[in-house]
């Protein structure tokens, strides 16, 4: 694999192991990236197994050519939020043995200045996962109302100074538009008074804009609900999150479908009927990276893996 596609997959063994792979199983890697997790899945599959990978990044689709000669593998160019639609088109609803999701932005995307994801590298203020379509971060910042920007920064970045930053962006863009990552990062650094130790002042705003531009949290919601409809009995969900907003969605989803439907106290309903509404069971507790993995790959530090299994009722 070329250096351009180099990428260290986080919690690799734990995530793929959590799928409990069967020789002839059918699996989905909803976030192909540079293929680290897919490679491990293929190594564990038998010759009759199948892996469907999904990614909306054109560079990831290019990277998938490394598996072009493997008849068990296919790649779909699209968002993982639509995974149930792709599976339905393939006639595989109820036959999927596992879904893997590695959420957030990948290292190659962060490291490529031209993608505009990082405040540490100057490049076009883009931030689109699929840079062949949609509105860029620069275009959104040029038109967004102060209230809208403040809401995005607060909701998706948990930024305490959301309104102040939004006002400053609106005031400055009338003189000079924000076209580069450095333009935005420098402004935020300049106007932020109480800086967090070991954290760039622009971290939360960049995260918020990226999540908004790519509808990332909506994609997660859609993917999780879709996974329930396509998983076979005992099929597994193996999901890596990188910040609290992502993990909160995954955690609540698993909890909600593990507990079954809530019914008012006193209704004449049996425990068996309640159990039938349970669709998942959590497999163990949340898994964090080891100190050794964090030392090898600092970006693993905030990762959280959650695994769940589709119940057979």
UniProtKB/Swiss-Prot annotation:
Listed under catalytic activity are: cytidine(1402) in 16S rRNA + S-adenosyl-L-methionine = N(4)-methylcytidine(1402) in 16S rRNA + S-adenosyl-L-homocysteine + H(+)
Q: Which UniProt keywords apply?
A: Cytoplasm, Methyltransferase, rRNA processing, S-adenosyl-L-methionine, Transferase
This entry's Enzyme Commission designation comes to 2.1.1.199
Q: GO CC terms for this protein?
A: cytoplasm
Query: What superkingdom heads the lineage?
Result: Bacteria
GO MF terms held by the record = rRNA (cytosine-N4-)-methyltransferase activity
Q: Tell me any Pfam family this protein matches.
A: Methyltransf_5
Where is the protein situated, by its record's location annotation?
Answer: Cytoplasm
> Main localization of the protein?
cytoplasm
**Keyword check for Nucleotide-binding:** no
Gene3D superfamilies in the record, alphabetically?
Answer: Putative methyltransferase TM0872, insert domain (1.10.150.170), Vaccinia Virus protein VP39 (3.40.50.150)
Instruction: Quote the PANTHER family the UniProt record gives.
Output: 12S RRNA N4-METHYLCYTIDINE METHYLTRANSFERASE, S-ADENOSYL-METHYLTRANSFERASE MRAW
Question: What is the protein's known function?
Answer: Specifically methylates the N4 position of cytidine in position 1402 (C1402) of 16S rRNA.
Official protein name in the record:
Ribosomal RNA small subunit methyltransferase H
């Amino acid at each position: 694999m070329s250096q351009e596609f180099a990428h260290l997959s986080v919690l690799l063994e734990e995530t793929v192991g959590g799928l409990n792979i069967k020789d002839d199983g059918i699996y989905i890697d909803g976030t192909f990236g540079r293929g680290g997790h897919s490679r491990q899945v293929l190594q564990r599959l038998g010759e009759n197994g199948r892996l469907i990978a999904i990614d909306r990044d054109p560079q990831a689709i290019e990277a998938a050519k490394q598996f072009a000669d493997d008849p068990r593998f296919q790649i779909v160019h699209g968002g993982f939020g639509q995974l149930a639609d792709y599976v339905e088109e393939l006639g595989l609803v109820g036959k999927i043995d596992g879904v893997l999701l590695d959420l957030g932005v990948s290292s190659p995307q962060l490291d490529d200045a031209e993608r505009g994801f990082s405040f540490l590298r100057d490049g076009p203020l883009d931030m689109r996962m699929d840079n062949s379509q949609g509105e860029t971060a620069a275009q959104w910042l040029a038109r967004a109302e102060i209230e809208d920007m403040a809401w995005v920064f607060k909701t998706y970045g948990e930024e305490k100074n959301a309104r102040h930053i939004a006002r400053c962006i609106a005031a400055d863009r009338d003189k000079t538009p924000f076209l580069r990552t450095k333009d935005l990062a420098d402004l935020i650094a300049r106007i932020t008074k109480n800086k967090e130790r070991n954290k760039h002042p622009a971290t939360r705003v960049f995260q918020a804009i990226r999540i908004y531009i790519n509808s990332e949290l909506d994609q997660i919601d859609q993917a999780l609900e879709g996974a329930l409809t396509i998983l076979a009995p005992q099929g597994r969900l193996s999901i890596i999150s990188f910040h609290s907003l992502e993990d909160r969605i995954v955690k609540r989803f698993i909890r909600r479908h593990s507990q079954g439907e809530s019914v008012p106290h006193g209704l004449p309903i049996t425990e068996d009927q309640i159990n039938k509404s349970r669709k998942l069971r959590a497999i163990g507790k949340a898994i964090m990276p080891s100190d050794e993995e964090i030392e090898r790959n600092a970006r693993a530090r905030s990762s959280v893996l959650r695994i769940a299994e589709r119940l057979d009722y």
